[in-house]
Amino acid sequence: MNIILFGPPGAGKGTQAKFLVKILNNFQVSTGDMLRDEIKKDTDIGKKIISYMNDGKFVDDEIVNSLIEKVVFDSSKKGKLIFDGYPRTIAQAKNLDLLLTESKQQIDFIFFLNVNKETIIKRIEKRKVEERRGDDDLDTILKRYDTYLKTTSPVLDYYSSKQNFYKLDGNLEIDQINKQIRDFLKL
């Protein structure tokens, strides 16, 4: 089963994806992790990525889509993908549709974690201390949140009319959000 988890930065997409990986034995496709991995490797792509992230901007679709393509066409992961933070733009959503069609797959569930700005700030401040992520300073997060609102709203419109779309209250506690997801998945 292929699943999309999307919502603003700090919504808990990664946390919920990790739960689903354990329950379903699926693979987490975290664009954030993939991008940070490129930065760690100090590749040319990694250097481009860091400039986007430091400016609070989304990384160019072409870069992100190329990383996603490798995962979608990995036969060992077919039908077992949990997309965490992808797609973020209409171009990415359409690219994902195309890749899945070409690889004879589909999205089974789309979960939108709807979270208010105050909750996000609290979560990011906590995550900054616990995980020491460089992209978690408040100014960068606020820029990413504003970029998210402008860029990802059309993606919400794109998916919200689909039968397998579920809007969840992402302001709830982690276990409550997880229960909502498990209920929809009938787990």
Question: What do these predicted regions represent?
Answer:
Residues 1-187:
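Glycine-rich phosphate-binding loop of ATP-dependent small-molecule kinases
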